[in-house]
Amino acid sequence: MNTAGPAGKLAGHAASGPTQRQLRVGEEVRRMLADLFARTEFRDPELVDVRITVTEVRISPDLKHATAFVARLGRSDVETLLPALKRVAPFLRSRLSTGLRLRGVPEIHFQPDTALDYAMEVDALLRQPDVARDLD
């Protein structure tokens, strides 16, 4: 008995990565959040005059949850802003509802994007004289 579903995927087995729809919705949410952070003056005192960039948004398979990876421009202390971002998440979600063409708008969760910090640490290590000597 063949239990293959659409596109030959076996029923009951998780896909190896996000679907095209998850990727498309994630990119649309990322674009809209980035625009909101650029154009909105938040009343929360912790977010006044703070520049935040949204580097990636991952959407759950059921499209009900969005994890937004954020970085603070020019600084690496984005973790201190996570409570403030959690407070403004319902406002951001309501703004997303006007632009997303989905039955339901995903709940937004914020995580710090540490990829840039990690890349800078690796770069600093590679520039150390003893490491550079070994690489030559």
UniProtKB/Swiss-Prot annotation:
Listed Pfam families: RBFA (PF02033)
Annotated region described as Disordered, given as residue ranges: 1-22
Gene: rbfA
Role this protein plays: One of several proteins that assist in the late maturation steps of the functional core of the 30S ribosomal subunit. Associates with free 30S ribosomal subunits (but not with 30S subunits that are part of 70S ribosomes or polysomes). Required for efficient processing of 16S rRNA. May interact with the 5'-terminal helix region of 16S rRNA.
Entry GO MF terms: ribosomal small subunit binding
Subunit structure: Monomer. Binds 30S ribosomal subunits, but not 50S ribosomal subunits or 70S ribosomes.
Protein name, UniProt field: Ribosome-binding factor A
Keywords: Cytoplasm, Ribosome biogenesis
Major place of residence: cytoplasm
The species this protein was found in: Gluconacetobacter diazotrophicus (strain ATCC 49037 / DSM 5601 / CCUG 37298 / CIP 103539 / LMG 7603 / PAl5)
